[in-house]
Amino acid sequence: MILIDGKSLSKDLKERLATQVQEYKHHTAITPKLVAIIVGNDPASKTYVASKEKACAQVGIDSQVITLPEHTTESELLELIDQLNNDSSVHAILVQLPLPAHINKNNVIYSIKPEKDVDGFHPTNVGRLQLRDKKCLESCTPKGIMTMLREYGIKTEGAYAVVVGASNVVGKPVSQLLLNAKATVTTCHRFTTDLKSHTTKADILIVAVGKPNFITADMVKEGAVVIDVGINHVDGKIVGDVDFAAVKDKVAAITPVPGGVGPMTITELLYNTFQCAQELNR
């Protein structure tokens, strides 16, 4: 069994990116810049953004965090985003979710200039993903999953891939990326009947449902590759959506939780920020 070590791979990829960013800055005198916006005082959001700030510094990308009070209105937030859209020194914009209930998430996502939409959530980038447009900014977690498969030499062409979970953030975009990579793809969701009949056929099984130890050994094919996107807190520990202990001896490769997909998400955010800077300054 191969352990797909996202933490180690992420470190290698950041070292590669740091070299690219340094060369880019030397040749263009432009420093890629990411601006992250937090609305309110959610501790998890602050932790996530702090880790993104730290990662930016590691590769030579500038970052700025703007923290707005909980009572910030939607129009005030949209006005700030408009200013950042028109600021040529800002290449990538991230609005940390969740937002307070009085702010419409979609209105905020749609207001970000597609070329600065570092999370890849804007409808333009969703459409570009479908069309395999090279200018597409791919959603960070799905992009990280595909990078893991590629870097570990896991063949997608002709493979049967099953994605459990159909969210706009992970399930749908990773299904499309797998399809673009010439896999045959089935996307399962809460209305899927007889889930096990699908998962036991999967050469590549990707799970993103937010339910601890949801996928058990009897639901996985011998020799499959399993990517666990879940992050769940159980008895003070972080566990995935896959019963790792039961499944690991049955599969060819599997990601751990923590230390699997999570680190790759932040690394791909850095790569997307660099892509934004390059595209905006062509």
UniProtKB/Swiss-Prot annotation:
Q: In which pathway does it act?
A: One-carbon metabolism; tetrahydrofolate interconversion
Outline the subunit composition. Answer: Homodimer.
Which residues hold NADP(+)? Answer: 165-167, 231
Stored InterPro entries = Aminoacid_DH-like_N_sf, NAD(P)-bd_dom_sf, THF_DH/CycHdrlase, THF_DH/CycHdrlase_cat_dom, THF_DH/CycHdrlase_CS, THF_DH/CycHdrlase_NAD-bd_dom
Purpose: Catalyzes the oxidation of 5,10-methylenetetrahydrofolate to 5,10-methenyltetrahydrofolate and then the hydrolysis of 5,10-methenyltetrahydrofolate to 10-formyltetrahydrofolate.
- According to the UniProt entry, the coiled-coil residues are none
Q: Which reaction does it catalyse?
A: (6R)-5,10-methylene-5,6,7,8-tetrahydrofolate + NADP(+) = (6R)-5,10-methenyltetrahydrofolate + NADPH; (6R)-5,10-methenyltetrahydrofolate + H2O = (6R)-10-formyltetrahydrofolate + H(+)
**Alphabetized HAMAP family for the sequence:** THF_DHG_CYH (MF_01576)
Q: What is the protein name stated in its UniProt record?
A: Bifunctional protein FolD
Q: What does the organism's lineage look like at the top?
A: Bacteria, Pseudomonadati, Pseudomonadota, Gammaproteobacteria, Thiotrichales
* Keywords, alphabetical: Amino-acid biosynthesis, Histidine biosynthesis, Hydrolase, Methionine biosynthesis, Multifunctional enzyme, NADP, One-carbon metabolism, Oxidoreductase, Purine biosynthesis
Q: Which GO terms describe its cellular component?
A: cytosol
**Keyword presence, Transferase:** no
Q: What is its EC number?
A: 1.5.1.5, 3.5.4.9
